[in-house]
Structures are given as structure tokens and as C-alpha cells.
């Protein structure tokens, strides 16, 4: 699995929100400990490994002898105040490649929208944690669905 990337605007530790259509803003006093794409990467690796479907899940782009590679790109992660209650909108693009043939097997854009328990940055964090849990499960299901069992 390659390290997750993020589209422009989401390559930051800033916690982003939307209160006007098509306009992202950042909370002044709140931030993620790392860019969200960097935080998603180990969670995807852990989820794939915990599935028990794979003998090993390599977390290095230079890993030798891998059959498949999963690339991911964070497309959106923000708290949307255009809804009440506000919602966390998380969107990730995943691309699964068969390495030896250098052929894309499948790709998808996976979206999670989770209501925030309250309209504060902390409420966004709670919802972001839930959306991340749902996203890691969805990515794992996507990969397992597209890779035949070893045998």
C-alpha cells in the first residue's frame, strides 16, 4: 500500500469547515495532529491486516514481491455547517492495481457523511472518528471484493 495522498487544499493539519457553498475555511484554534491523509494511511493498513484475508500487508511503496497495490487519495474532509446538525464529509478515491501486470483492477470514490453530535470543532472530531471507522471498513470491503482468495 502506498502512502495516502491528498488533493490541493487538504494537504494540511488545519481543520476545515464549510458554511458557504464552495468555500472552505479553517478553524482558528483547532488543528489535526497530522495532515488527515497521513493519519488515514496506517488505519487502512491496520484494517486490511486485521481482516485476515491477506498473508501480509506491506506499508511501503518499495515493498518487493507484492501482488497488489492500493493507492488512496483524500478528496474531502471537512465539517459542513450548511446542514443542521453539521456533518463531516469524508471522500476518498481508491485505486487497486495488480502489480505484476501493472493493471488497474478497480477504482472507486467512497463517501461517508456522518452527523456531528454538536456544531463545534470537537463535534466534528467525534464525527470524523466515526467516518474514518466507516471509511476503513468500506476500503477493506472494496479490496476484498476485487481480489480473489489465495488458493
Language-model segment annotations:
Residues 1, 44, 72, 92-94, ...:
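Buried hydrophobic packing residues in well-ordered domains
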Residues 1-37, 145-151:
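A structural "domain/chain start" motif
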Residues 4, 73-77, 111-113:
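Generic short beta-strand segments
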Residues 24-31, 100-141:
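Short secondary-structure boundary motifs at beta->alpha junctions and helix caps
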Residues 37, 41-45, 51, 129-132, ...:
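Extracytoplasmic/secreted envelope proteins and their assembly/folding machinery
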Residues 50-57, 141-151:
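Surface-exposed helix-capping loop/turn segments at secondary-structure junctions
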Residues 51-101, 117:
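Surface-exposed short loop/turn segments
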